[in-house]
Amino acid sequence: MPIFPKPKVTVILANLGTPDVPTASAVRAFLKQFLSDQRVIEIPKLLWKIILYSFVLPFRPKRVAHAYASVWGQDSPMREILFAQTDALKRQLISHYPQLDLNIVPAMTYGNPGVQHILKDLAASPQEHVILLPLFPQYSATSTAPLYDAFANWIPKQRHLPGLTIIKDYYRHPVFIQALVSSVQRFQQQHGKPQKLLMSFHGIPQPYADKGDPYADRCRETARLVAKQLGLTPDDWAISFQSRFGKQEWVKPYTDELLTTWAANGIKSVQILSPAFSADCLETLEELEIQNAELFLEAGGTSYQYIPALNTSVEHLELLRQLLQAHLDALNYSLAYSAH
């Protein structure tokens, strides 16, 4: 009777991306890749190319590099956290499936380790199954869909194709909501409660939402469920959207404008939670924690506190484990045990 090798299964844990180092040249390379994706910028290609190369890439990288440098440790926060999340899931999951040749790898849509390089490695070592877990709790064509595109471009070039599972999102998963609630409760036990809790999500252009991108609605549902579980009244909290880019209208309300309005209207203390980010990064550590704090305090507020992203919290790792284990259990049965 032939002895079959263990079925190879790879889990790809994917986040958006980051420059290699906080320098203008590295940021330029990153922005060039990121902003050249038509999922991100839906402007006619030739027109956008002129804008990108004439007005964005010559000037923006230096300013953005300075912002990255202000939050950079030994590496980019996003990459450090992604690697730590991956290592933790390896410890939790690989020994649980001895019948599978299971690997868990980190990937970035833009920058390194790039998802294209991960897929190239998989082609060199054909897999029975690949599970892609984008670390975007709320699906958007601007964030999650480019990972679908990477697979769509890779598949026609392969002869030995794996089974493929993509976990689209988890914006209302009860373990996700509880993880956010626990992070707020833990923070407030130490720092007290503010007048307002603001749940700030990365924004998208309003025309994208008008064309059917479900992201903003999913953000609102995440925020509603968190507020409900915290027992907040409508006066206790609000939702907003940050990080707008360019001159077109984005989904509203805008985080910076809401904060200054609150301060002008006598709101003195605010805490910020950003449930769109699975790892702290430039948009949370620099934009939310530094820039928006300055805006609020200069407008008359007296207390502004940022509640960290879920990062490698026990509750977050439990969420990721559960998201993956449901699929791994099925694969373990269908791939490993059917071979015996």
Curated annotation (Swiss-Prot):
Catalytic reactions on record: heme b + 2 H(+) = protoporphyrin IX + Fe(2+)
Cell compartments where the protein resides: Cytoplasm
SUPFAM superfamilies noted in UniProt: Chelatase (SSF53800)
Signal peptide start and end residues: none
This protein's record includes keyword Nucleotidyltransferase: no
Main localisation: cytoplasm
Keyword Metal-binding: yes
One GO BP annotation of this record: heme biosynthetic process
Gene3D superfamilies in the record: 3.40.50.1400
MF terms (GO), sorted A to Z: ferrochelatase activity; metal ion binding
Pfam (any one): Ferrochelatase
Keywords (A to Z) from UniProt: Cytoplasm, Heme biosynthesis, Iron, Lyase, Metal-binding, Porphyrin biosynthesis
InterPro entries cross-referenced by the UniProt entry: Ferrochelatase, Ferrochelatase_AS, Ferrochelatase_C, Ferrochelatase_N
Function description: Catalyzes the ferrous insertion into protoporphyrin IX.
Protein name per Swiss-Prot or TrEMBL: Ferrochelatase
Source organism (scientific name): Acinetobacter baylyi (strain ATCC 33305 / BD413 / ADP1)
